[in-house]
């Protein structure tokens, strides 16, 4: 069985690779602003799940996995910062605070035409870090294309005090959620091992 990852995220691909899965990787090409335009006052979970589902439905494949992650902090849902300046601003806001990384998962099974959806929320305690560390981290470029402006598995690990949840969910997709989705369709995760 071939899993198609409806994402260009290197982090999501690495999570799958480390778990023995070599997915076919396809950019979903979803206009995220247009995809959520019809939502009225969505919760953070509804927002990320809607995007994850749109991505899974946009790609052809036997079994397609879509995902989307955003950071909920101080009542604000944040995606990727994209710029060094925005990264610094966000880190000034989030250092020393607790936040929630909300990740939507959508697994589309072509054989049944059904989709399994699950949102996973992971609590993150950010470290109280210096202005110098924030500036240096932003300058590396690493956090610019990451939800919440951080990574767990690389330089961003220095900025995390603790997490409450599965580490794979923080990196990009929850392996437990994927396992539950596979179970839902009657597959075993070992079917994906390449």
UniProtKB/Swiss-Prot annotation:
Keyword match Cell cycle: no
Cofactor requirement: a divalent metal cation
Enzyme class, UniProt record, top EC level: hydrolase
Catalytic activity reported: a ribonucleoside 5'-triphosphate + H2O = a ribonucleoside 5'-phosphate + diphosphate + H(+); a 2'-deoxyribonucleoside 5'-triphosphate + H2O = a 2'-deoxyribonucleoside 5'-phosphate + diphosphate + H(+)
Main location: cytoplasm
GO molecular function: nucleoside triphosphate diphosphatase activity
Keyword Transmembrane listed: no
Signal peptide, first to last residue: none
NCBIfam families (UniProt xref): maf
Protein name: Nucleoside triphosphate pyrophosphatase
Organism: Corynebacterium jeikeium (strain K411)
């Amino acid at each position: 069985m071939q899993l198609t990852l409806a994402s260009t995220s290197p982090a999501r691909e690495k999570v799958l690779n480390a778990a023995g899965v070599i997915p076919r990787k396809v950019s979903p090409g979803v206009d995220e602003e247009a995809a959520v335009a019809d939502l009225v006052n969505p919760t953070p979970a509804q927002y990320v799940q809607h995007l994850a589902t749109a991505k899974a439905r946009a790609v052809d494949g036997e079994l397609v996995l879509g995902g989307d992650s955003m950071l909920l902090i101080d009542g604000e849902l944040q995606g990727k910062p994209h710029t060094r300046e925005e990264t610094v601003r966000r880190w000034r806001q989030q250092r020393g605070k607790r936040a929630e990384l909300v990740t939507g998962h959508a697994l589309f099974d072509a054989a049944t035409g059904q989709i399994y959806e699950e949102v996973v929320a992971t609590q993150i305690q950010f470290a109280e870090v210096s202005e110098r560390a924030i500036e240096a981290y932003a300058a590396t470029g690493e956090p610019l294309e990451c939800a919440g402006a951080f990574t767990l598995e690389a330089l961003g690990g220095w900025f995390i005090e603790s997490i409450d949840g599965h580490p794979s969910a923080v990196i990009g997709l929850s392996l437990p959620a994927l396992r539950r989705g596979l179970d839902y369709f009657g597959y075993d995760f070992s079917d994906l091992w390449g």
